[in-house]
Amino acid sequence: SVGFKAGVKDYKLTYYTPDYETKDTDILAAFRVTPQPGVPPEEAGAAVAAESSTGTWTTVWTDGLTSLDRYKGRCYHIEPVAGEEEQYIAYVAYPLDLFEEGSVTNMFTSIVGNVFGFKALRALRLEDLRIPIAYVKTFQGPPHGIQVERDKLNKYGRPLLGCTIKPKLGLSAKNYGRAVYECLRGGLDFTKDDENVNSQPFMRWRDRFVFCAEALYKAQAETGEIKGHYLNATAGTCEEMMKRAVFARELGVPIVMHDYLTGGFTANTTLAHYCRDNGLLLHIHRAMHAVIDRQKNHGMHFRVLAKALRMSGGDHIHAGTVVGKLEGERDITLGFVDLLRDDFIEKDRSRGIYFTQDWVSMPGVLPVASGGIHVWHMPALTEIFGDDSVLQFGGGTLGHPWGNAPGAVANRVALEACVQARNEGRDLAREGNEIIREACKWSPELAAACEVWKEIKFEFKAVDTLD
């Protein structure tokens, strides 16, 4: 008979290969698969591998014009999820040739582009990716990284302090600049545009950039420290985004900001390249992440979005707090915080890390803790995140009863007290409250802050837990 065998056949015949030895150059993915009733896990896992690589629903004659064995994704291992009915972790290996070099956009289009609407699955979640060194090397990564940032700012041996300017919408540019100045003068390293602040009728971007730059230079002159304000360059088109970044560079400011999920990976990578070429640091906000990562059985875990950001490029990224008003279980959060900062991360399922990841020499990203935190959290934050982090207190600075500058003073005093106590060998986890109370003696600003927030807690059960 001439031709090929037409018709529909089971995916598992071609795409489930339990004997496959993964290659060092493969991209590996761990999917949490919830098959529809009656669909065997092997078929579900194979379907994911097929639909996110070379497969389609029926045999096609053009299959004969290529080598499926060379290009197909393979489901090479399946394990049931402990404590969950009908959930499995399916491990899929993708040959590197399926992906365009240096394109996070293409990587995601391939791996998570189509398969999440697949009918044979009730739900699907991408838990982790192993990016091979061969692929890592095709990305520029963060514009500068942790060490270069410290050198630029001349700030060592402690976490950096930030503050998001509130109310986030409605201030005029001049009043906004005033708020920035007060915070920086009081002792913060950075202030931040809120992620929703782009260029609205009440405050156009160019006016804001100019007033913030003025605030920055005034605060620098008064304090003798380098200051920064994250100027949000996010815009409706890539050209407009670049125009804003160029203007920021012309003003001579040290850092700009981007919302990488709403802005998109293509825009983000473009901006990251510009930032490296022009000496700008890049702060990344993760607006929209919870739409993708909050459901336990469907979507993508934030650790995947964090890896993607390190490849696309950013010097800071928001990463939850463990202690404030937003999600983040401690071990899981520290898992992806280490993925952002370190060169090499061992597989460790207790922290949700499914694969060993080697970033070789790609620069690291500073995790930003932000959301509902205040001076009483400082010992815990210093202990959990360590020196290489940015701690951001929005309401925890601007909500100070005496104003922004005293709010900034309170945070800086609390931070310096915690760092000193840690360096003297004290246990921040146990003696934290005591350390803050002692520091209050020398700082009326801190004492006032401690009084305001002594009872505030945001306590709900975490959603993001290991099984």
From Swiss-Prot:
A single GO molecular-function term is: ribulose-bisphosphate carboxylase activity
Positions where N6-carboxylysine occurs in the chain: K192
UniProt xrefs under SUPFAM superfamilies: RuBisCo, C-terminal domain, RuBisCO, large subunit, small (N-terminal) domain
Cofactor mode of binding and number, as noted: Binds 1 Mg(2+) ion per subunit.
Gene Ontology biological process terms from the UniProt entry: photorespiration; reductive pentose-phosphate cycle
- Compartments where located: Plastid, Chloroplast
Question: What PROSITE patterns does the database record attribute to this sequence?
Answer: RUBISCO_LARGE
EC numbers for this chain: 4.1.1.39
Q: Which cofactor does it need?
A: Mg(2+)
Q: What class of enzyme is it?
A: lyase
Chloroplast: is it a keyword of this entry?
yes
Residues annotated as binding substrate are N114, T164, K168, R286, H318, S370
Tell me where it mainly resides.
plastid
Q: Name one GO cellular component term.
A: chloroplast
UniProt site (Transition state stabilizer): K325
Catalytic reaction list = 2 (2R)-3-phosphoglycerate + 2 H(+) = D-ribulose 1,5-bisphosphate + CO2 + H2O; D-ribulose 1,5-bisphosphate + O2 = 2-phosphoglycolate + (2R)-3-phosphoglycerate + 2 H(+)
Q: Which residues bind Mg(2+)?
A: K192, D194, E195
Q: What else is known?
A: The basic functional RuBisCO is composed of a large chain homodimer in a 'head-to-tail' conformation. In form I RuBisCO this homodimer is arranged in a barrel-like tetramer with the small subunits forming a tetrameric 'cap' on each end of the 'barrel'.
Give the record's family classification.
Belongs to the RuBisCO large chain family. Type I subfamily.
Summary of subunit composition and partner proteins: Heterohexadecamer of 8 large chains and 8 small chains; disulfide-linked. The disulfide link is formed within the large subunit homodimers.
Its annotated function is as follows: RuBisCO catalyzes two reactions: the carboxylation of D-ribulose 1,5-bisphosphate, the primary event in carbon dioxide fixation, as well as the oxidative fragmentation of the pentose substrate in the photorespiration process. Both reactions occur simultaneously and in competition at the same active site.
Write the protein's name: Ribulose bisphosphate carboxylase large chain
Species of the source: Tasmannia insipida (Pepperbush)
